[in-house]
């Protein structure tokens, strides 16, 4: 009997969050280990489908770095990275677009639909969903100055066609977006999936942005998880060496999204089963929440 009571208590804990998020939009960046482990893939699919069944508009933006690396290797194309960004020439861009839109996107959509969802795959080129311009990466020179470097067909999102996403949401569909953008002349751009998720969340004025990662969240210098960060503390935490390395662009993405109108953003551990539900429907969550 006790375990039944505990289940009831869990449902009651979720109730205020269900009320809060019903009719609102949540944007989830799906990537990392959660995309390769079968149990985690199923867990993620069921989480997203449950959110949609509760009246929560859920938008998925996926990555695909490992799949791109594998295919480039098969084609004998060697990748170069500048500050974590893949240098993307025309040949590399062809592979990136093929893998993200023709392979990974279809796999994610298929998995959601297989488990009872109504997912629709999109790339940023569909309906000019993600209008982009070339992103010039800043690189520190020997004298300490910053120089902007052209790294090929790598894009920054300048406009999101939110009407396309909202049309799908109103039709009870789950939009699944591949991070390939389009330029003014129709050229394709490789766009960081975290950046896409943040821009989409900002355009939709989402209630929450969630980034799935392969770490617990933001940790302090003692290695302990920081459950919450307010916006004003972010510069201090970066300058103080608490937020470092690859976590800096993720946190910056969350900050930018909040500045664009997103209520809250979370960086969570995608290696945890049902991490999305635990983050949204429990009092403590499973990662680091960033808020005003």
Curated annotation (Swiss-Prot):
Enzyme's top EC category: transferase
EC number(s) on file: 2.7.2.8
MF annotations from Gene Ontology: acetylglutamate kinase activity; ATP binding
HAMAP family linked to this entry: ArgB
Positions annotated to bind substrate: 64-65, 86, 190
Any matching Pfam family: AA_kinase
Family under the similarity heading: Belongs to the acetylglutamate kinase family. ArgB subfamily.
Name recorded for this polypeptide: Acetylglutamate kinase
Cellular component terms per the entry's GO annotation: cytoplasm
Recorded superkingdom: Bacteria
Keyword presence, Nucleotide-binding: yes
PANTHER family (alphabetical): N-ACETYLGLUTAMATE SYNTHASE, N-ACETYLGLUTAMATE SYNTHASE, MITOCHONDRIAL
Function: Catalyzes the ATP-dependent phosphorylation of N-acetyl-L-glutamate.
